[in-house]
């Protein structure tokens, strides 16, 4: 997919870089797989802000994406078209099964219209096919990896994402994630062969603040620009630094401080991710 720089007809378009994919469907999405999506603007049921820097943005439907792919084993399918999805960084593919049913799945790297796909333990080792990890060769690049069997893919789902199957030991397999973390998963969990497509998504330049507002992202104000009542970094005469270890608005250290508290799954992590 080529990157396109826009002509500098305005300050906002001067540095804008877009990812252009001529293979994407230019019409409307498949209506039976759409659901309404209501803007929460980062608020909970009491109207209190629980996630900062969210609000506004263009209204859009949710595309129902099949992350499980476990109830059509052995039924061949074909890629009908590739589509843009405003809810995720990756593109999605509309596939049609031999029995006529249509579903959305994340589009793998190199996926083309008309490509044949299959899921199940008998599926060939080919990009876009979904298999249990026990049937995938060691060393394969995979994406859309399940952590719990039957729950659906939870790992390596964003644009350009992937993982590597390192080994199988008994009922567990070891998978290395992009972060460098090595994690154990049950061999009954499923994964898709290949990488997630739209890998150039990280190279785009939005060009102007308004483009983020279209996406529902509000401005982020620095703590040192606030008052002491609003942030631990706030206050001071003139321009001042934090004067302490950088922390969040609630006092938690923000740079390199480990906040993981899920002891239940700690035993599944063989090697923690590398420090950057």
From Swiss-Prot:
Basic and acidic residues bias: start-end ranges: 230-242
Instruction: Please list where the region (Disordered) is annotated.
Output: 224-276
Tell me one GO molecular function of this protein. Answer: transferase activity
Q: Which domain of life is it from?
A: Bacteria
* Oligomeric and partner information: Part of the 50S ribosomal subunit. Forms a bridge to the 30S subunit in the 70S ribosome.
Q: What does this protein do?
A: One of the primary rRNA binding proteins. Required for association of the 30S and 50S subunits to form the 70S ribosome, for tRNA binding and peptide bond formation. It has been suggested to have peptidyltransferase activity; this is somewhat controversial. Makes several contacts with the 16S rRNA in the 70S ribosome.
Indicate the family of this protein.
Belongs to the universal ribosomal protein uL2 family.
InterPro entries, per the entry: NA-bd_OB-fold, Rib_uL2_dom2, Ribosomal_uL2, Ribosomal_uL2_bac/org-type, Ribosomal_uL2_C, Ribosomal_uL2_CS, Ribosomal_uL2_dom3, Ribosomal_uL2_RNA-bd_dom
Q: Which GO terms describe its biological process?
A: cytoplasmic translation
List residues traversing the bilayer.
none
Q: Sorted alphabetically, which keywords does the UniProt record give?
A: Ribonucleoprotein, Ribosomal protein, RNA-binding, rRNA-binding
> Looking at the keywords, is Metal-binding present?
no
**What organism is listed for this UniProt entry?**
Polynucleobacter asymbioticus (strain DSM 18221 / CIP 109841 / QLW-P1DMWA-1) (Polynucleobacter necessarius subsp. asymbioticus)
This protein's GO cellular component annotations are:
large ribosomal subunit
* Protein name (Swiss-Prot/TrEMBL): Large ribosomal subunit protein uL2
Pfam families registered for this protein in UniProt: Ribosomal_L2, Ribosomal_L2_C
Q: Which SUPFAM superfamilies match?
A: Nucleic acid-binding proteins, Translation proteins SH3-like domain
Quote the gene name from the UniProt entry: rplB
